[in-house]
């Protein structure tokens, strides 16, 4: 399996619960390296631009409202099969359907406040990482 990078966002609900460290520990235990990280409070424009792919979906406004409701922790993760590994760690989008021991099962409250975002493919990972971390801010280690 190849070394990949993926984008991860710890959403406002999980930041408010003070579980960033617990989530980071799961990334690292799974062999993922955090190669870039920052805490930000997204502007409405940033959230709308980042989630533009969902603009026509009925949940778009609620998603944007949620993502600007508090600070988020954004990180680029790197490792063998990082995209699939992170998605396995996150669990199903709906925490009620997420496997026990996944981030969403343990820390999320609802399908809307579902604790984390992760890139779904190599192409989206590249776009999402570039959105938040221009090349000079990502460090291979």
Swiss-Prot record:
Any one GO BP annotation for this protein: UTP biosynthetic process
Pfam families found in the cross-reference section: NDK
Record organism: Cupriavidus pinatubonensis (strain JMP 134 / LMG 1197)
Cofactor needs: Mg(2+)
Designated name of the protein: Nucleoside diphosphate kinase
Catalytic activity: a 2'-deoxyribonucleoside 5'-diphosphate + ATP = a 2'-deoxyribonucleoside 5'-triphosphate + ADP; a ribonucleoside 5'-diphosphate + ATP = a ribonucleoside 5'-triphosphate + ADP
UniProt binding sites for ATP: 11, 59, 87, 93, 104, 114
Gene that encodes the chain: ndk
Keyword Iron-sulfur on entry: no
A GO CC term attached to the entry: cytoplasm
Keyword Ubl conjugation assigned: no
Functional description taken from the UniProt entry: Major role in the synthesis of nucleoside triphosphates other than ATP. The ATP gamma phosphate is transferred to the NDP beta phosphate via a ping-pong mechanism, using a phosphorylated active-site intermediate.
Lineage of the species this protein comes from: Bacteria, Pseudomonadati, Pseudomonadota, Betaproteobacteria, Burkholderiales
Superkingdom of the source species: Bacteria
Active site location: 117
Location(s), subcellular: Cytoplasm
Keyword field: ATP-binding, Cytoplasm, Kinase, Magnesium, Metal-binding, Nucleotide metabolism, Nucleotide-binding, Phosphoprotein, Transferase
């Amino acid at each position: 399996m190849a070394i990949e990078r993926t984008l991860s966002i710890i959403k406002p609900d999980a930041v408010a619960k003070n579980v960033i460290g617990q989530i980071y520990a799961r990334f690292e235990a799974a062999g993922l390296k955090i190669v870039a990280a920052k805490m930000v409070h997204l502007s409405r424009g940033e959230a709308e631009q980042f989630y533009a792919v969902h603009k026509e979906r009925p949940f778009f406004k609620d998603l944007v409202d949620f993502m600007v409701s508090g600070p988020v922790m954004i990180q680029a993760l790197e490792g063998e099969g990082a995209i699939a590994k992170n998605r396995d760690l996150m669990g199903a989008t709906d925490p009620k359907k997420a496997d026990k021991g996944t981030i969403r099962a343990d820390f999320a409250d609802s399908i809307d406040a579902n604790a984390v975002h992760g890139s779904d493919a190599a192409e989206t990972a590249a776009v999402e990482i570039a959105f938040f971390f221009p090349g000079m801010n990502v460090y291979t280690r």
